Amino acid sequence: MVKANNTMFQFYLVMMDFFGKYLSEKYSQSNYIEDTKHYQTVIITKIVQMFHSLELLTKNTLDEVSARCLLRSLLDCVTTYSFIYQRKDENDMLFRHYLYALDGWREYKKSVITILEDNEYKDKEDYGCDYVINQIEEKLKKHIYYAKDRVTANLLILNSNWKYESLQNPRSLKYGEMYSAIGFTNKSIDYFQGYLSQFAHGLCLSNKPTADSEQMNRVLYECIPIADKFIQTMNQTFRDKRMIDLFLRTDDIKKFMDSKGFSFDDLAEFAHALIRKDKTLLI
């Protein structure tokens, strides 16, 4: 089972690489904060690279702690991406997108720029930080949500709160609640918040004896639900039929099936992954 799922992980990597390249070329460089499609490609590129780094860790080291810390980081990155951008309401998605960007720039200003001495080297982003923050705030104040409920919108802007539950209940969700909101099962959430947290926060289980290769393989096995959610989010966010058609026609699939590690015994596992219980398809 572990081998089959690790082979499936390799297939997911092939899929991610293709989708990431296709979307990055289609939605190329943009300087407009409201260009959410391009911004998503930046996030997607980052996440795909993290999946590749996880593979390298599990193949080339026995560093289970670093691998599981990276797995937890991947989980949070995929959760954030899905929580913000996989929404039926375009207005809600755009408002959260602005708040997410505002949160990042404000944190950059607070944590990086303000501690630099005047004679230290500064990136051009350092000098333009206030300008960018002001531009994002202006976008938020022109959004339909601001006209609809100015008091709540101002509260969300003040706290850069892209994690809000709803305009009617603007409290900030915790990550465990966001895991649930994007569709992870309670069993998966218990694993994320329990077992993975032991490694991410330096708790007792992170001090166990050195892992073996089988334990490292299990990290990829446990990564499958996260990779699955990531691919599902890309497809449901962009809804690009041409991307799927091109992928299914590409030589990448044939190369993967011709690779040394592939076994036709794994096809049943692929079927379970690509066709869900509710008869929906991953791609």
Predicted region positions:
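Secondary-shell segments that build the walls of catalytic and ion/ligand-binding clefts
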Residues: 1-38, 105-244, 249-283
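Extended amphipathic alpha-helical segments with heptad-repeat/coiled-coil character used for oligomerization
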Residues: 87-117
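Amphipathic alpha-helical scaffolding segments
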Residues: 69-76, 91-100, 212-222
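Residue-level detector of alpha-helical recognition elements and their boundaries
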Residues: 62, 89-90, 210-211
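Long, hydrophobic/aromatic-enriched structural stretches that serve as scaffold segments
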Residues: 22-87
